[in-house]
């Protein structure tokens, strides 16, 4: 959250930043030389908006998205329970990493059913039940493109899975970090 308390037409020598670890707690008060447009004590440097990747550099893309009502995503315990009940499911389970998981080292998994045959799916009733719930969730979506994907419940609605190992960079991090968290992931990680 950001709240700007006041503006002045004249340049005041007294500038103050208030930061809250807990919005209900007491602020950390910092005297500032200058409060820039990014609301930090730094010179007024404004980064230009850029839609294109600088020439010669690979393009950053958003990762794959299931839009599945959560039914293709598994916690550690759900993964273990599923494999115990249906050992053949192990070949269809992949690590699934979003920004929160990357930053906090939280393990999460997904059912990556790309290429699964109807016979293989029917042989795993618990996986099939999850797929049916994906169909229901997508059918009830207010978004037409998601409803259209109800006919393909085994697939992510947005499949941007790289064919080579890649760098994963969270879309949102924190200005309090000295470094941007980045992970080198294999093609097996969604």
Model-derived regions: residue spans:
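Leucine-rich repeat
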Residues: 15-19
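Short, solvent-exposed loop/turn segments at the edges of secondary structure
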Residues: 1-2, 106
